[in-house]
């Protein structure tokens, strides 16, 4: 029997190991993000070799129920040996509709359906903005913004200076508008929002693939945009506005704007006839004083308009009546270039006065959700949650998760589930790929026709070699 300090040390060592195991099993555990599905919130970039590490507190759900927009680590029900990290988008009992980059709660049926956008809390919204300008220009290592990233009207009225632009109104209207022809305009690009050293290899890989887009993952224009700048004026303007123009086929053209006139601001929506205001907020105070730089920002996000001055929110205005729910998808014939009948154009406009200087120009876009293969109306069963990755273009999540059950006999030959020879039902994740492509690490089942074999990973992570040929299922 051990006595003295050796025994005490062994006891202490044993208790420490037991405590560590219990802590890891029940309380807290560290994970490395393996994939890109939650980027850029949580990095798991193979292209840039960047993998965030997170600390998961397992006891949180003991004290409170999961909430919408929570980031959650969970065991994938169809492959329980894998931990997934996603964001909770749908709650038990929800009826969801995904369109135009937003997620909606649906009430009613048919023509009586009512859509209510699910808005992110302000602090989360701030974190999920993805910078487009100057990030895209810097990613391409370009030094100038005119005329490729921005266009100007009239062109002679706008000059590019170090750190910004000048607009000469000469008593008329001049405006600067975002076009970014190199990356297709205000489109949901997978590399938006990343640091340049991460975005560049991601974009280069896409270019190497010819900017091909999975047919189940269409690119879309992004109507939810925030733009801002520091405005310096030499003398009083008749009007200065930050505007977002949205054009979609078979839908009315909308221009959302934060306009400043005579020391007053207003949030407004105009249609194809810009002389007609479809809706507007109450006026609010906002000053543009000659010789005093002022930071202004404006966003159209989650069917509301928001204005800020020097970081302080001035006004919000509900714009659900003039929604961009439909018409955002880009045809597959040319998925990298937004056609002329589908575009989102952030604009900086000024009328009257003299020279206007814009610095710290910035354009961000919102997190853009796409439906992909999910049904039009998504019914979330009671006791279940609808999970999506922040990087919707590279996320395998609730939109595409599908279970498959295969029957086998005692020799692992595939047989119909209702066959008397069926002695076992194997359940797992259905993530089959094109047989001509390279296998994916999570691909299952994998068919090997020349060997009369199907490789399948069951729900417990066991790799099984089944005998049979691929069929319609």
Predicted regions and their residues:
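Extended hydrophobic leader/signal-anchor segments used for secretion and membrane insertion
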Residues: 1-473
């Amino acid at each position: 029997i051990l006595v003295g300090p050796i025994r005490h040390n062994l006891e202490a060592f044993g208790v420490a190991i037991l405590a560590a195991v219990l802590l890891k099993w029940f309380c807290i555990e560290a994970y490395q993000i393996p994939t890109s599905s939650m980027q850029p919130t949580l990095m798991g970039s193979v292209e840039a070799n960047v993998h965030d590490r997170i600390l998961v507190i397992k006891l949180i759900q003991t004290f409170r129920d999961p909430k919408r927009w929570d980031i959650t680590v969970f065991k994938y029900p169809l492959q329980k040996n894998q931990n997934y990290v996603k964001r909770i988008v749908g709650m038990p009992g929800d009826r969801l509709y995904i369109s135009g980059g937003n997620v909606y709660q649906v009430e009613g049926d048919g023509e009586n359906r009512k859509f209510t956008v699910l808005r992110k809390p302000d602090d989360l919204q701030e974190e999920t903005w993805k910078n487009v300008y100057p990030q895209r220009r810097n990613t391409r290592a370009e030094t100038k913004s005119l005329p490729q990233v921005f266009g100007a009207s009239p062109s002679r009225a706008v000059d590019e200076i170090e750190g910004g632009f000048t607009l000469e109104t000469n008593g008329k209207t001049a405006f600067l508008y975002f076009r970014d022809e190199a990356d297709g305009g205000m489109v949901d690009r997978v590399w938006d929002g990343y640091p340049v050293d991460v975005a560049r290899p991601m974009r280069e890989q896409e270019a190497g693939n010819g900017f091909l887009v999975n047919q189940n993952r269409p690119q879309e224009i992004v109507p939810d945009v925030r733009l801002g700048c520091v405005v310096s004026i030499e003398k009083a303007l008749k009007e200065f506005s930050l505007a977002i123009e949205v054009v979609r086929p078979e839908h009315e053209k909308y221009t959302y704007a934060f306009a400043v006139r005579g020391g007053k601001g207003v949030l407004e929506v105009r249609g194809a006839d810009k002389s007609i205001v479809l809706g507007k907020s109450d006026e609010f105070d906002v000053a543009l004083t000659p010789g005093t730089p002022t930071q202004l920002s404006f966003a159209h996000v989650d069917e509301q308009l928001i204005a800020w001055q020097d970081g302080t929110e001035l006004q919000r205005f509900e714009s659900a009546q003039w929604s961009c729910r439909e018409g955002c998808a880009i045809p597959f014939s040319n998925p990298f270039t937004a056609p002329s009948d589908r575009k989102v154009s952030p604009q900086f406009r000024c009328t009257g006065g003299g020279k206007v200087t814009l610095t710290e120009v910035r354009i961000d876009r919102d997190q853009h959700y796409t439906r992909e293969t999910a049904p039009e109306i998504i019914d979330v069963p009671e006791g279940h949650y609808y999970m999506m990755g922040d990087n919707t273009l590279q996320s395998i999540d609730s939109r595409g998760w599908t279970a498959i059950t295969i029957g086998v006999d005692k020799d692992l030959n595939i047989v119909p589930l209702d066959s008397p020879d069926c002695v076992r039902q194997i359940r797992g994740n259905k993530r089959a790929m094109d047989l001509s492509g390279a296998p994916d690490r999570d691909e299952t089942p994998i068919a090997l026709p020349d060997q009369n074999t199907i490789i399948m990973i069951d729900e417990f992570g066991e790799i099984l070699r089944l005998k049979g040929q691929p069929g319609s299922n």
